[in-house]
Amino acid sequence: IEGYIIILVSHKLDEVFELCKEATILKNGSKIKTIPIPFERKKIVDLMFKGDKSIDKIKNPISRIKRENMHIDLKYYKKGIAKIPEGKKIGVIGLQGSGNDQFIKKIFDKSISISRKINKNRIMIDKKNIYYTPSDRLEKGLFSDLTLIEHMALSENKNNFINWKKIKEYSRKKINEFNIKGTLNSQAKELSGGNQQKLQLSLIPNEKGLLAIEQPTRGLDLNSTQSVWNKINERIKDDICLFFSTTDIDEVWDQSDWIISFSGENITDISEKKDIKKSDIKFFISGIKTR
């Protein structure tokens, strides 16, 4: 359009190359570099992830205990059956809006079906055993105006009557166990992001299940991030498995046993962490490399 400047915000390299004459690369709110288009794609990806730790060392050792494989039906993505052992942490990584958060939602709404082997029979995991926490903590995960004790009452109430004495004791125990910085009467909207996330985790039933967590540490400071992962890692020892989405390469590398990479709402790679290098991930999520 003559006389106008159009600013396109995108994470899709194909789109930028097709529509733009130059591109400015941003990361965490800071300008990295402005470049002319066309430009070598590999160099753009390197600039996009400049400053990420490049150590390939695996931080969380993979358990050598043999577990039965889960079967993850990926026909929605025109893939076959992915086989991953139970008890694993599966990180689902992609740039913002690439489809990795939607993957977690699809596990919860059963668009992606997962089965496990019990007594030689393959059984589908029931929705009641899938414990989902959304990334929009106040919008979708919690009731902003309800207090901590009211959240606990809704979570624990198994019938039409609430025993407030028991709920008060239970709530105090959970607040202490998850180190939530708030009182029984604190509203969810009054909590920090880290404490809102810990409140979400505290509401997950104690029964064994499959954890499906969107962006577990988005927007959290270092201490809150570590605290949240400590609670998740305590829990996963006894659960079926954990699926979590993230846009952070360091987080997916540090916390995953298996990694599913997304670009443009498509799966570009599914690998056990020991079979790839950390440096591969940036190319998987930018769509430059697939397997």
Task: Kindly label every feature range from the protein language model.
Residues 1-291:
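Glycine-rich phosphate-binding loops of nucleotide-dependent enzymes
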